[in-house]
Curated annotation (Swiss-Prot):
Expressing tissues: Neurons L2-4 and L6, also called giant dorsal LUQ (Left Upper Quadrant) neurons of the abdominal ganglion. Also expressed in smaller neurons in the CNS and in peripheral organs such as the kidney.
Main location: secreted
Modified residues (Phenylalanine amide): 33
Segments crossing the lipid bilayer: none
A GO cellular-component term linked to this record: extracellular region
The protein's name: Abdominal ganglion neuropeptides L5-67
One GO BP annotation of this record: neuropeptide signaling pathway
Localization (cell): Secreted
């Protein structure tokens, strides 16, 4: 009698394990991930008709993209943007003496 009860219990345990393993997962994603907007919903402007090369269409870039605002407040650091290639509307970047010295060392090292 003991073996019969043991076999029945074992059969129930095996049935429970197999039913859990063989069933489909209960979690299903809700909605579509990465939904795209319908082009007709957005107004067609000159900017949106241009190809998107990953550049910002904003006239100014937010400071928060580059710096943590909390760190800026505590350090007192106020970044100034400048242009190395001479972009109009930005002051030219001025190299410091140590920057020129480092550039010369790197040029000598790499033979540039």
């Amino acid at each position: 009698m003991k073996t019969a009860v043991l076999l029945v219990c074992l059969a129930y345990v095996m049935a429970a394990i197999l039913s859990l393993c063989a069933s489909a997962p209960s979690w299903r994603p809700q909605g579509r991930f990465g939904k795209r907007t319908i082009p007709d919903r957005l107004p067609q402007t000159e900017e949106s008709s241009l190809p998107d090369f990953g550049f910002s269409h904003l006239p100014a870039l937010p400071l928060e993209l580059f710096y943590n605002p909390r760190d800026l407040v505590h350090s007192g650091f106020r970044p100034r943007l400048c242009s190395v290639s001479g972009v109009e509307g930005y002051p030219p970047c001025v190299e410091s003496h140590s920057d020129r010295k480092m550039k010369n060392l790197l040029d000598d090292l790499f033979g540039l």
